[in-house]
Amino acid sequence: TMDFAFTAQQETLRREVRQFIAENLTDEIVEEMDIHGGADRPRGRGSDVSALFGKIRERGWLGIAYPKEYGGQGGDRVSQYIVEEEFHRAGIAITLGGSGAPAILAAGTEEQKQHYIPRLISGEITFCLGFTEPHAGADLASLRCSAVRDGEDFVINGQKMYTTAAHSATHIYLMARTDRDAKKHDGISIFIFPMDVPGITVRPLWTIQNNPTAPLGTTYGAARTNETFFDNVRVHESCLLGEENKGWRVGAMGLNLDRVGAWRYLISVSRDEDIVNWVKNNQFGDYSPAKNPAIRDKIAELWVEAQVCRLMTMRSMSIVERGDEFTYEGSAEKVWAPEHGVRITEAITQMLGPYATLLNGSPRAIDNGIFAHNVMGSFQSGINHGSVQVMRDQVARRGLGMPSSRKTTKEGAR
């Protein structure tokens, strides 16, 4: 049998987090977080946000599920989920998602674990992800960014796309080709190194969510990602994560573990709650959206889908918590949550019509343009951390034992 109830200790934690939010979180902080991002994006913030996250870190809430010997609390993933859920419902995201911490714990040396994990939890170190390239997106193993050994160093040359937070992160978690003669999945290595080493150039890449017409300080986050160039960047071999030429498995494992977490489910829930609150709290003359049977049916359907996503998240966390083999579950979660987000977007546009397209700064924008923000965000949610199409292929192969739908070749590896 499965027990879906939270423990008394977990419920106590939830009450503590709610009380903390009530006492410390302001509308101004939520707005600034919309601009600058989550807990792993510490730079570029005002003093109020910095003070808030200082208090969060003092309580150890960012590292609940990490081992005590590396600065965490040695707690369980469900408790970590509870903290993330309560903050997300209040309007801000706190997570170490995308930090590379799971991969470091699994594949790093003891020295790397001791150095990076406590500093990731404290916020002293933050990562950006250097995986995708202009010619290596869905087929990531076709990457061309090279790392050539020179004695005890590696010299890195190439380009990475969609390196979100590269302009603010202290370090990069980078995948590069270290053996051009090997099969394309075999000649890859993972490196972790500071972003201030010579030879790195970061250029902004603005997404659909950028809103240049909004009043200063009122645009929503996720508008900027980056393209990053590496020109004879020299790093020491100690920057290798895992073995040389064995980085594909490390990178894939890290991405899969990173897909386990509340954040993807909570994005869907927050969008559900946005539309539910609008429907319940608005009246247009004699017309009440909340009394429209078609709208009520659609909202109920979306709520059920959100609960399915929640259960998938909890199941994935339970598998990892027990130490069982974790193969396709993260990919399945990655398929369901973004597609649920798209269905929310479709419901928003059907209910609000042209008002769903009005951005913050428009005179008739609803709730500061949150719905337009959600609509635009849904387009990229199916691509981040692996496209939905690739995730389906992984579920078919790893979960159902079916053959791959794609051919594996060496093309693109050179």
Question: Where do the model's predicted regions map?
Answer:
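Alpha-helical interface subdomain recognition
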Residues: 2-90, 94-95, 107-112, 119-124, ...
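Short, conserved phosphate-binding/catalytic loop or strand-edge motifs used
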Residues: 97-102
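FAD-binding core of flavoproteins
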Residues: 2-5, 95, 114, 118-284, ...
